[in-house]
Swiss-Prot record:
Domain CheB-type methylesterase: 157-349
Domain notes: Contains a C-terminal catalytic domain, and an N-terminal region which modulates catalytic activity.
Lineage of the species this protein comes from: Bacteria, Pseudomonadati, Pseudomonadota, Betaproteobacteria, Burkholderiales
Name of the featured protein: Protein-glutamate methylesterase/protein-glutamine glutaminase 2
Role played: Involved in chemotaxis. Part of a chemotaxis signal transduction system that modulates chemotaxis in response to various stimuli. Catalyzes the demethylation of specific methylglutamate residues introduced into the chemoreceptors (methyl-accepting chemotaxis proteins or MCP) by CheR. Also mediates the irreversible deamidation of specific glutamine residues to glutamic acid.
Catalysed reactions, as listed in the record: [protein]-L-glutamate 5-O-methyl ester + H2O = L-glutamyl-[protein] + methanol + H(+); L-glutaminyl-[protein] + H2O = L-glutamyl-[protein] + NH4(+)
Amino acid sequence: MTAAKIKVLCVDDSALIRSLMTEIINSQPDMEVVGTAPDPLVAREMIKQLNPDVLTLDVEMPRMDGLDFLERLMRLRPMPVLMVSSLTERGSEITMRALELGAVDFVTKPKLGIRDGLMEYTDTIADKIRAASRARVRQAPQAASGTPATPMLRSPLLSTEKLIILGASTGGTEAIKDFLMPLPPDSPAVLIVQHMPAGFTRSFAQRLDGLCRITVKEAEHGERVLPGYAYIAPGDSHLRLARSGANYVAHLSQEAPVNRHRPSVDVLFDSAAEHGGKNVIGVILTGMGKDGAKGMLRMREAGAYNLAQDESTCIVFGMPKEAIAAGGVHEVVPLHSMTQRVMARLATYGTRAQRV
């Protein structure tokens, strides 16, 4: 008996995009488009009639804004939503907000040659729909009504040599925010790979920088890695930890994708194993696939202490599951306890710098 196909509803004001998404999705053996809608008002009725497993949603549409629709949907009928975004600064900012509101992930429309560009994305779109269909959906956050502020964690007396090295993918934008917000201003440096296209990582970093006590920025090639900063790998660039004399520096490159990703978590983790060794705390959060599993094992073998997000708090328990299976993880921790566990672990290292 064959498994039921994933039912997808595509919502986009462009007839061309609706047609291409239908072509891409229906070419896969395990999914089908059960309907298309030109705007959210039509989509609302189709959701009731068709009960889709996954919704693809354009971020900018007439009649009702995609974000307004998403916010209502996640409040009234939470379901897996994959945003379809334009490669523009405005598109990236709206997409970041959509992920905050509960969208599982996003795909980008190419700027030119939409037909060829989208068809090239076939595997990516199909993989993201599969992941979305299995994702644990977050409801839209309620408006702040006396919700407690994120507790301020105090930094133990630390050597500036300590580093937090983090990788994430699907669901990672919100998980990274939840991890970074409690960090104290004098936290060890954090190097981050989140699978995301060029342009979107800048919006992501800016949004986090406005929320966190540490400084959050896109990593720049050759810059010194300092405590109190989080460095996010720019989309379409690998990020490595490197040494320049006694200092840690960020190294960016355009080398071939690894595990189909650039930036790749394995690339960052491998460099941390080589140059950070025992000074590293490794963290792997929610994400699809196995990027980071081999690198986390190498970090462990080099003396790092590694933590993985647990299944119950992951949007997609792919990357943490693979890292655990590979043997690279010391502790499996729910997201809401992750920052505290990392800081507690750092406190056990004491004050003495550990040179590698």
